């Protein structure tokens, strides 16, 4: 994502946007390419021919990647906190995973943590549903991924809100002998949706367990 455009602070940057929809491709004054992403990238590669970025630019990218990895390792490393953060939980699983393990996530704050901390070491080992915060896709999607990759471990990161929405597919995975590793993190309910609700001027409406109208 753009980080509310904080990722593009250089006033001289140029944006090339590939999209099947002309309206979306032209947003933010981008140089538009209307077409399928894979086909468009292949044609762009052919058009570029032997062109390469400068060695100075390659060095900068390597240095920035090294700095980023060091930062992520530090922030997601072992902790003495009474309760580990999302970053600590994802980091612990990542460090103990195999390169072929597949990570799945979809909704809430876990998406942001997983895409930063889970740095794939093999192709097709990271599935994240960004688009519309598809709560509970983490479970049904993980089941489908396991069915397609029976010889790999599938690890899905789930908040308690998504878990309550669609835990029945965990049962489906068990009875069909499709093993899943489900990491359920306590978020007190749908905390991210609650935050969005409040930031837009609304009031809490049964998003958090503590503010829901439940009997004792």
Segments and roles (model prediction):
Residues 1, 19, 104-106, 157-158, ...:
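Short beta-strand segments
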Residues 11, 19, 36-40, 44, ...:
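General structural feature for long, well-ordered alpha-helical segments within catalytic domains
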Residues 14-15, 100-103, 153-155, 179-180:
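Beta-sheet entry/capping signal
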Residues 25-26, 32-34, 38-42, 112-216:
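Thiamine diphosphate
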Residues 65-146, 151:
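Active-site diphosphate/adenylate-binding microenvironment
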């Amino acid at each position: 994502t753009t980080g509310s455009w904080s990722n593009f602070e250089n006033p001289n940057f140029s944006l090339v946007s590939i999209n099947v929809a002309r309206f979306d491709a032209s947003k933010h004054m981008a140089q538009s390419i209307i077409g399928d992403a894979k086909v468009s990238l292949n044609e762009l590669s052919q058009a570029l021919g032997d062109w390469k970025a400068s060695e100075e630019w390659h060095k900068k990218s390597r240095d920035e990647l090294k700095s980023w990895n060091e930062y992520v390792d530090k922030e997601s490393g072992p902790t003495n906190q009474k309760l580990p953060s999302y970053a600590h939980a994802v980091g612990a699983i990542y460090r103990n995973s195999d390169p072929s393990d597949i990570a799945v996530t979809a909704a809430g704050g876990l998406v942001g943590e997983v895409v930063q901390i889970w740095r794939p070491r093999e192709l097709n080992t990271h599935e994240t549903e960004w688009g519309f915060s598809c709560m509970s896709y983490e479970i049904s999607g993980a089941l489908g991924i396991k069915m397609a990759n029976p010889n790999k471990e599938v690890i899905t990161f789930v908040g308690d809100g998504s878990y309550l929405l669609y835990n029945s597919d965990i049962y489906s995975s068990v009875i069909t002998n499709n093993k899943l590793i489900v990491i359920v993190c306590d978020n007190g309910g749908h905390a991210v949706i609650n935050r969005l609700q409040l930031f837009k001027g609304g009031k809490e409406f049964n998003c958090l367990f503590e503010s829901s109208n439940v009997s004792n």
